[in-house]
Amino acid sequence: MSQIVRVALDVPLYRYFDYLVSGDEQVTAADIGRRVQVPFGRRTMIGIIVDLPPTSDLPNEQLRPIETVLHDLPRLPDDWLRLTEFCSGYYHAPPGQVMLSTLPVALRSPKSAKGARRLARPATSAAGGQALPALRAEQEAALAAIHQAGPGFHSFLLHGVTGSGKTEVYLRLIESSLLAGKQALLLVPEINLTPQLEARVAARFPSVALVSLHSGLGEAARQRNWQAALTGTARIVLGTRLAAFTPLPELGLIIVDEEHDPSFKQQDGVRYSARDLAVFRARQLAIPIVLGSATPSLESWANATAGVGRSRYQLLSLRERAVAGARLPLVRRIDTRLDRAENGLSAALRAALAQRLECGEQSLLFLNRRGYAPVVGCPACGWTSGCPRCAAHLVLHLRDRCLRCHHCGFAVPVAKACPTCGNQNLIAFGRGTQRLEATLAEIFPQARVLRVDRDSASTRRQWEALAARIDGGQADILVGTQMLAKGHDFARLTLVGVIAPDAALFAADWRAAERLFAQLMQ
C-alpha cells in the first residue's frame, strides 16, 4: 500500500495537499515538520510535511509523488506547527502561507533549498563581561514574584516608568533561563531598538550564542541566525515581530518589550499580533512570559487588573527610576492660541532651544510626520494631493521633488501646476520633519540639526551611523518621528519638545488617544 504525506504549500488556499511517497523514499512520523520538495501544477515547490494520513480524499491514482524529503536541517518542532496552525485559524490565513512565510527565503525556494546546511554556523558574541548592577527593592520584588510562581505557564505584566530598570529585570530572567539550560526569546517592536539592546545583552552574556532576527538583515544573515535558533546553537534570540515564529527546541522564556507598541501587529500579508502569539506560545509550552511597558495597552492593563480570579496577568510595578535621585521630567504645556507659534515653534520653545545651545546640551523635537508637508493644495479650486490608490494624502518630499503616499508607496513628481484648474501657485500645507529641519537651520544657523526618520534611517547601517553622531556629540538639535522617541538613552539630551501633539487625536484610529499618551510618556 502506498504511503501518503500531507503537505502545507505557500498558496492562497485554506487546505493541505496530499502526495504519495516515491519508492526510494522512506517517511516516518519523525519526518513531520520537515521540508519537502513536491510538484505543484507546472512548478516545483517547497512545502512542509504536517501529517501522514492513512487515506486521502482522492484516489491514489490522482496523487502525485513527492520529489524529495529535505534532511539538511532538523525538522520543525511540534510546538511550531501548532503555533502556525493556531495563527492560521485565529487570523483566517491560509495555513501554508503562514508556515512558509515565516521561513527564510532560501529555505522555501527549490533552487537554494539544498544550500541550507552550508550556511548554518554558530553565532557567538565576542563582547567582554560586565559587572552586575545592584538591584532596587522594586526590581528584586518583581524578580522574586516571577521566580516564586514556579514552573509552568505564568504571564506577567511588568509596568515600569521610563528608566525604571525593566531591561535589567529582563537580563536577570534571561540569566535564570540560561542556567536552567533553556533558550530565551526577547521581542522588541522596532528594528532600530535592536542594536542598542543587542549590545547590552551581548555584554552581559559574552560566552552565550546570541542572534538577532529582523527585516533589516540580509537573507544570508537571517538564514544563518534562524538555523542557529532551530538547531539550538543560539541560546538567546532577539528580534522583531516575525521572530515570534522562530523555531526554538528548548525555549524556556519569552519577553515582549514595549508590549503596547502597534509595530507588533503585522498589517499586510498574513496579519497577526506577535504579542498575542507569544502569549499563546508560552501557554502551549508551559513557560513564563513577561510583557513589559511604561504605558501598557488597555487590554493588557485590563487583563492584569480585572481582580482576583479574573486577572489573566500578574501585575508587577516599577514606580521609581533606576538611577538614584533621578526624577520624572517637568512637563510644560504651551497653549499656542496665547503663545502663537511661528513656523511651528512657540516663543517659549525657541527660548528653551537657545538656552540648551548655550549650555552645549542636546534637544529633541518630536514631530510624527515624515516629509516636508503632509499635503499640497490649490487655493484657487481647492484641489489637494490625494493618492489615487488609497484614501491617504500624498506627502511632499521636497528634496526628492516628489509626492509620496506613506501608506501604499505610490509616488509621482511634484506637479508644477494644479491638475484641475492649472493654477501654478500651489501651497504646501502643514509641516513634516524635513520642513522643521529647514526651519531650525534658519532660526539657529550655528546649530547642528540632525533629522532621524524613515527617510534618513531606512536601514540599520544608516541608523547606527546617525546614533554614533548623536552619542558623539555631533548634533545639537534632533528632529525625529516615533522611531527616535522611544527606547533610546542619549546622555546629553536635556530638552524634548513635542510639536502639535493634539493633531494625533484626529487620526482615523480608535486607539488614537491611547497611542498619543504612550508616545508622550516615552
Segments (PLM) and residue ranges:
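SF2 helicase motor core recognition
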Residues: 239-251, 373, 440, 460, ...
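Conserved helicase ATPase core of P-loop NTP-dependent helicases/translocases
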Residues: 218-230, 448-480
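Conserved RecA-like helicase motor core of SF1/SF2 enzymes
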Residues: 257-276, 471-476, 481-522
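Conserved helicase motor "Helicase C" RecA-like lobe of SF1/SF2 P-loop NTPases
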Residues: 194-205, 376-389, 433-448
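Accessory, non-ATPase domains that flank or precede helicase/AAA+ motor cores in DNA-metabolism machines
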Residues: 1-295, 299-301, 305-326, 357-358, ...
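Conserved RecA-like helicase motor-core motifs
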Residues: 185, 205-217, 316, 388-389, ...
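Cys/His-rich Zn2+-binding cysteine-cluster or related metal-binding knuckle/ribbon modules and their
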Residues: 12-14, 215, 219, 231-234, ...
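Flexible beta-alpha connector loops of hexameric P-loop NTPases
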Residues: 211-219, 261-272, 337-343, 425-429, ...
